[in-house]
Swiss-Prot record:
Organism annotation: Bacillus pumilus (strain SAFR-032)
Residues spanning the membrane: none
PANTHER family recorded: LARGE RIBOSOMAL SUBUNIT PROTEIN UL30M (PTHR15892:SF2), MITOCHONDRIAL RIBOSOMAL PROTEIN L30 (PTHR15892)
Gene3D superfamilies assigned: Ribosomal protein L30, ferredoxin-like fold domain
Keywords: Ribonucleoprotein, Ribosomal protein
Domain of life (superkingdom): Bacteria
Biological process annotations from GO: translation
Taxonomic lineage from the root: Bacteria, Bacillati, Bacillota, Bacilli, Bacillales
Protein name (Swiss-Prot/TrEMBL): Large ribosomal subunit protein uL30
GO molecular function, one term: structural constituent of ribosome
Keyword Cell wall biogenesis/degradation recorded: no
Length: 60
């Protein structure tokens, strides 16, 4: 696994269930097309899997 993950919010959270909104917010994403970098670990991977239809992930 890569050391870092570059996560970009590709779709809006408008109209999404509250748990998905909270997950996106917890990842540090507020606006569409915003990108954040996180360490690659099981917790982050789990959050990405939960909102995989809203984000894109690039390994660094």
């Amino acid at each position: 696994m890569a050391n870092k993950l570059e996560i970009t919010l590709k779709r809006s959270v408008i109209g999404r269930p509250e748990d998905q909104r909270v997950t996106v917010r917890t990842l540090g994403l507020k606006k569409t097309n915003q990108t954040v970098v996180h360490e690659d670990n099981a917790a982050i991977r789990g959050m990405i899997n939960k909102v995989s239809h809203l984000v894109s992930v690039k390994e660094q």
